[in-house]
Structure formats: C-alpha cells, structure tokens
UniProtKB/Swiss-Prot annotation:
Succinyl-CoA synthetase functions in the citric acid cycle (TCA), coupling the hydrolysis of succinyl-CoA to the synthesis of either ATP or GTP and thus represents the only step of substrate-level phosphorylation in the TCA. The beta subunit provides nucleotide specificity of the enzyme and binds the substrate succinate, while the binding sites for coenzyme A and phosphate are found in the alpha subunit. Its cofactor is Mg(2+). Pathway: Carbohydrate metabolism; tricarboxylic acid cycle; succinate from succinyl-CoA (ligase route): step 1/1. Signal peptide: none annotated. It comes from Haemophilus influenzae (strain 86-028NP). Gene3D superfamilies: ATP-grasp fold, A domain, ATP-grasp fold, B domain, Succinyl-CoA synthetase domains. Its EC number is 6.2.1.5. One of its GO terms (biological process) is tricarboxylic acid cycle. Binds 1 Mg(2+) ion per subunit. The lineage of its organism: Bacteria, Pseudomonadati, Pseudomonadota, Gammaproteobacteria, Pasteurellales. This is Succinate--CoA ligase [ADP-forming] subunit beta. Substrate binds at N264, G321, I322, V323. Belongs to the succinate/malate CoA ligase beta subunit family.
C-alpha cells in the first residue's frame, strides 16, 4: 500500500525527521486558507498521486504568489496526472500539497528497501539526488552507495556515518545525516515498510539537511497490525479492477495486452504470462485466483477480466493441487453462462481430476477450447486473439 507524500511526511515528523511545513488542499477555495498556515511568500505546489516522475510531468511547481497557487490548483484538481510510472490514463489528482520552500545548496538521494537476496533491509544513498536519479541508477552505479541493516538490530550509528562520509558530509552534517538514517531505520522496521525514499534529501545553504520529498510503501501483509496506516489508504489511486479484485481476495494487476489470464498461484501466473509472450501474445492482466479457488471466485474473476475492453480471449490455466480440476471445470462453465462471456475461452487443466475436468468441459454446451498442455494453451490463446480460432 502506497502513501501520499503529505501522509509520509506526517510519519517522518513523528519520527523526528526534518521536513518543511506543509498543508493539503482539496479544492481551489481552500488554497487561501491553506497558504495562511504557511510562512513565506512562495511555496512548492505538488500534485498528490501514487507515482513518481511528477516534476517532469508538470505536477510540481514553485508558485510565486497566492494567485499562481490558485491557478495551479484549478489546473490540476480533478484531473489526471500522467507520468512515466503511470499508465496512459494517469492517476487522479484529488489533493494539492503546498510546502514552504528552502534555499537548496545540494541534493542527495536516500532510500531503504527489502533486499530479499540478503534477507535484510538495504539502504541506498547517492550524492546525485533529484529528478534524474533513474538515469544515475542506470548509468552511474559508482554513485550509489549501499549498506545492509539486520532487521533484528536495526540501523546502527556507524552505518549512518559510513554513508554520510561517502556522500561527502562531515561535522554537524554527518551527525544530521546519521540521525536521519537512524530515524528512517526505526520507521521502516516499526511500520513494516517495503520502501521508504527521500528524493531529494537536500542540504540547505544554511547547512541543514531536509527531507524535501517522501515516498512510503507499506507491506500489505502487515496491514492487519497497522490500522492507523490502513486508514490512510486512498483507493482512488488504485485501478478500479484491482480494487474490485481485492474484495474477493483475488490478486489482479492490469496490463496492456489483449489476452486475459486466470491462473491459480502467483508463480504459475507469471509463467503463463511468459509463455504467452513467447508465443507472440500480450497478457492483459495478472490474475491469481489463489489455491482455494471456488466457483464464486472464478465467476468474479471472469467479470473483472471482462471489464477490460481490450480483452479478446481468456486463458484459464489451473493446476489442481489443493483444488480439484472437475470442480474448476464446473465453475468455469457456470461462470461463462452467468457472466455471458462473448470472447473465446481457452482452458488448460492439470493435476487432481484433470481428465475428469476436461471431460466435463468437452461434454458441456459451452464454447470452450480445451488444451492438453501449457504450450498448446498459449498457442490457442494467441491465435484466438488474432482471430484465428
């Protein structure tokens, strides 16, 4: 689950991390009231969406007066911001965050992620922060400095000092950076985060370090013990189909192809998408119905897939381990009849009662293409998407 910048900065402040004063508005009429809470005569105006690349897309602007702030809010509130991290539709802008400015001397980058290879938390720092950090990550790896922290012990001061030295910080600035490092480490571990990013972390001309931007992602699997964070969830930022899938415990991710995929198991789902690509097709989605797939969940999965107008064929790939393939076959037939599927459906069943499941499909009056192997299923689906079935 992602948080907005203003929400992340509230957490930063709670953990003693240095941020500038800011306030959120949700309507143009609120702009004057919001700016009255802030000092200075110019402010940073930032569209609040769950995506990076806002600055390059025009979603961040330094406004010089109240009139310019109103104009920015009027331009963006209720609109959709498209960045290199969103799809072509972008994400809705429902809030503008206004923040006091500072005199920037230098920009750094600092983040923490879960490193699954080492089973630790990886802190990454760079002296080249700002809007072009993606290019730095691709072309200037020597500018990325890393340190691993053990989740049992958390970050240690010497690790913060080590990163600070590599960034060229010394004296009081080294201590400031170490304090920020320790605060982020506590925040990351105590709130079960999967990502925290400060870009840029700036050094002001007055010699202070400030977290000028903040990005936080929370581990969805830990939300049951963080009701305070769950309350911050903004469902308007989610794909509508993904939000609907969550209600039925379906794992759905929208993609940009035309072959709808319904699979049980995340690994099998990824393998299915790979083989569809191998045969020249493009998956329209990732959809994992889970190990305990039922008729009802299969029907809901069909409904969600078919809300995508790009879908030309649905590929159902089920391995019967926990579930029985004959029950899945009955569920597919019932779902096709209930939902009124108008596109070709390719079904591949393997595992428990697979042969029985294939017989049920063959004896039904529903137009379903049955595959004997995953390769055949992919080939049938790709051909059907091309209109060759």
């Amino acid at each position: 689950m992602n948080l907005h910048e203003y929400q992340a900065k509230q957490l930063f402040e709670h953990y003693g991390l240095p941020v500038k004063n800011g306030a959120v508005c949700q309507s143009v009429e609120d702009v004057d009231l919001v700016l009255a809470q802030l000092s200075g005569d110019k402010w940073a105006a930032k569209c609040q969406v769950h995506a990076g690349g806002r600055g390059k897309a025009g979603g961040v602007k330094l406004v010089q007066d109240v009139e310019e702030a109103r104009a920015f809010a009027e331009k963006w509130l209720g609109q959709r911001l498209v960045t290199f991290q969103t799809d072509k539709l972008g994400q809705p802008v429902n809030q503008i965050y206004f923040e006091e400015t500072c005199d920037i001397d230098k920009e750094f980058y600092l983040s923490a992620v879960v490193d699954r290879a080492s089973q630790k938390v990886m802190f990454i720092a760079s002296p080249a922060g700002g809007m072009n950090i993606e290019e730095v990550a691709q072309n200037s790896l020597h500018l990325l400095h890393k340190v691993e922290i053990d989740p049992l012990f958390g970050g240690l001061p010497y690790q913060g000092r080590e990163l600070a030295f590599k960034l060229g910080l010394s004296g009081t600035q080294n201590k400031q950076f170490t304090d920020i490092f320790m605060g982020l480490s506590r925040l990351f571990l105590e709130k079960d985060l999967s990502l925290v990013e400060v870009n840029p972390l700036v050094l002001t001309k007055q010699g202070y370090l400030v977290c000028l931007d903040a990005k936080i992602s929370v581990d969805d699997n830990a939300l049951f013990r963080h009701k305070d964070l769950l309350a911050l969830q903004d469902l308007t930022q989610n794909d509508a189909r993904e939000a609907e899938a969550e209600k039925f415990q379906l794992n759905y991710v929208a993609l940009e192809g035309d072959i709808g995929c319904m699979v049980n198991g995340a690994g099998l789902a990824m393998g299915t998408m790979d083989i569809v690509k191998l045969y020249g097709g493009k998956p329209a989605n990732f959809l994992d119905v889970g190990g305990g797939a039922t008729k009802e969940r299969v029907a809901e999965a069909f409904k969600i897939i078919l809300t995508d107008p790009s879908v030309k064929v649905i590929l159902v790939n089920i391995f019967g381990g926990i579930v029985r393939c004959d029950l899945i076959a009955e569920g597919v037939i019932a779902a096709v009849n209930e939902v009124g599927v108008r596109v070709p459906v390719v079904v591949r069943l393997e595992g428990t009662n697979a042969e029985m499941g294939r017989q049920i499909l063959a004896q039904s009056d529903v137009n379903i293409l049955t595959a004997q192997s995953l390769q055949q299923a992919a080939e049938l689906a790709v051909n059907a998407a091309k209109g060759e079935h």
